[in-house]
Amino acid sequence: MDVIVTIQHPAHVHFFRNAIEELEHRGHDVHVFAREKDIAIDLLEAYGIDHEVIAGRASNLPGKAAIQLAYEWRLFRRARKIGPDVMMAIGEPGVVHVSAALGCRDIVFTDTEHATYRKRFVYPMADRVCSPEFYQDDIGENHVKYPGYHELAYLHPDRFEPDPAIAEEIGLAPDEQLVVMRLVSWEAAHDIGDEGIDDIADAVERLEAEGARVIITAEGDLPPELEDRELSVAPERIHDLLYRADLFVGESATMATESAVLGTPAILVSTIEGMGNVRELRDEYGLVFSYADGRRHERAIQKAVSILDGDEDWAERRRQLLADKIDTTNFVTALVEDDATSVDVFRNPALPDQ
């Protein structure tokens, strides 16, 4: 089969990279088209994934609309030459539009409940929409839920083995506590109007006062006084760093989830509320702590200090999570090769595991 995958964000590279490798190993031709977004292209190159960049960046809504139109036209022209059997993406309208024009099958993955535009104008047109079980909305007959997370497509123990050398690379002493902090730009369409950590310098100062080392990864520029805390390792090593960390504090639900499935407690500071993955990881597994109200900054720092001073068994909480969840990459590849059977397995618990 010919399979087209589109990449809109660095997280999409992680989500699809193992599926791309497996599908190619099974004899399928996988064609990857990407748009520039943060370190997405760097990751594709780091993992050796052949790809073509067909869209750039924009910082305002008119610019984003123009780039989206150009992107979809370029995607259509390339897909028409390929004649794909399947096109897949994460929450991306271009794949749905182009697959409809070409008469091929599309698969759209999502785990973002507050993406209102997609729910209204993308998912109803898709052949198949796939989400984790925590996803609270019912999209329709084309919707199938699976027991996992996007992040388990690349951080399931069958897919990821942490490299302990990361500690030496960043000069971290064996008994030194590490906090990874993630700051987002709030420019994504579904993030506009939301906020996170009120005072970054204050957060860093108070965490370091506990004896922890703070490393920051940010979508934008850091204040000059914090530039020496910025992440200095290759972007594909971030998950080794999260595994080694004693705590994650940040504004990214994706990275909070990554930390949680690796067994690192995560504090999410964001005014975005109602995310199913955060709710499940908080209420069922106790691996994420979220703060969204007007006192979010102070409450988050207080919780961070208590975690650094505590002795909870986070590894046991991770074991409980993994016992309940699947390797998401297996689900992705199964859908590509046999959609009907795969969907039946996940919709009918009486059927045997496949």
Please tell me what each predicted stretch does.
Residues 87-93, 241-280:
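A donor-sugar binding/catalytic signature common to diverse glycosyltransferases
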Residues 309-354:
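C-terminal amphipathic helix plus adjacent low-complexity
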Residues 107-109, 118-131, 242:
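A conserved, positively charged/aromatic
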Residues 130-195:
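A nucleotide-sugar donor-handling region in carbohydrate enzymes
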Residues 70-75, 221-255:
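Donor nucleotide-activated moiety binding/catalytic core segment of transferases
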Residues 37, 47-51, 55-58, 181, ...:
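Catalytic donor nucleotide-activated moiety binding site of glycosyltransferases and closely related
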Residues 24-67:
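Conserved nucleotide-sugar phosphate-binding/catalytic loop shared by glycosyltransferases and other
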Residues 261-307:
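Catalytic binding pocket for nucleotide-activated donors in carbohydrate/polymer assembly enzymes
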